[in-house]
Design a protein with these regions (language model features):
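Terminal beta-strand-rich extracellular "head" domains
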Residues: 164-206
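Beta-rich globular "head" domains
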Residues: 140-177
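Noncatalytic modules at the cell exterior or secretory-pathway interfaces
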Residues: 202-218
Length: 218
């Protein structure tokens, strides 16, 4: 620990015979409020947002501009009515990235989304979800914009009907090309119907594979 700040979160320390001690204490409390159970509003914005909420934190990516110039890899915290204070994240620090809806771990340079472990030499185990909203069109099948990632181990695909599906179909299936019912068959068309397409064992896709919805009986 230095004479002026704590080693991990760089909280300012009150100095002997310091005037206006409350300023230093308030700054430390504000930093604690932002850094404990850390939530990053984003780790991808390359410039500060126009009107950040006081205390909101952001992960500054490489090459950031504006007020974030030269702050690559640091945590930017909105403070003092439009200004910014910065903190140095440590390897292994965890955060929830709000605009991505995923937890992330700092690997010493970047926030790794979905990381469950970080190896000494750069390996990692990651888990993540992807979510889309799909509007159906007329036809026997619809290929969604959700692609199962190449090299990823898939454990399931879930779906929910938010508005009743109209037309002559009696039900629908959820799957991928060559396995149109892999994640569900005879699925309902009424609002609130859903598919819990859990696989009996994880499956790896080696090429990007779109999730496909197929009508039955229509």
């Amino acid at each position: 620990m230095t004479d002026h700040a704590t080693p991990r979160l760089s909280l300012p320390l009150v100095q002997a015979a310091q005037a206006q001690k409350h300023v230093t204490v308030n700054e430390s409390l504000a930093r604690l409020d932002g850094m404990v159970n850390l939530v990053l509003q984003s780790a991808q914005l390359d410039a500060p947002p126009g009107q950040p909420v006081e205390g909101a934190c952001y992960g500054v990516p490489p090459g950031a501009s504006g007020a974030w110039t030269g702050q690559d890899g640091r945590i930017a915290m909105a403070a003092n009515g439009g200004g910014w204070s910065y903190a140095e994240p440590r390897r292994g620090m965890q955060a929830f990235v709000a605009d991505r809806g995923v937890s992330a771990v700092f690997d010493g340079e970047l926030w790794v989304e979905g990381a469950l472990t970080l190896g000494q030499f750069g390996s990692a185990l990651m888990a993540r979800t992807e979510e889309i909203e799909l509007e159906l069109t007329a036809g026997g099948s619809v290929a969604s914009t959700l692609y199962l990632p190449p090299g990823g181990m898939v454990i399931g695909v879930a779906a929910r009907v938010t508005q009743a599906i109209t037309g002559s179909l009696s039900s629908w299936r959820l799957g991928t090309e060559g396995a149109l019912d892999r994640f569900g068959a005879n699925l309902g068309t009424q609002a609130g119907s859903w598919a819990r397409g859990m696989l009996s064992q994880p499956l790896t896709y080696w090429e990007p594979a779109p999730v496909i919805l197929t009508a039955t009986g229509g």
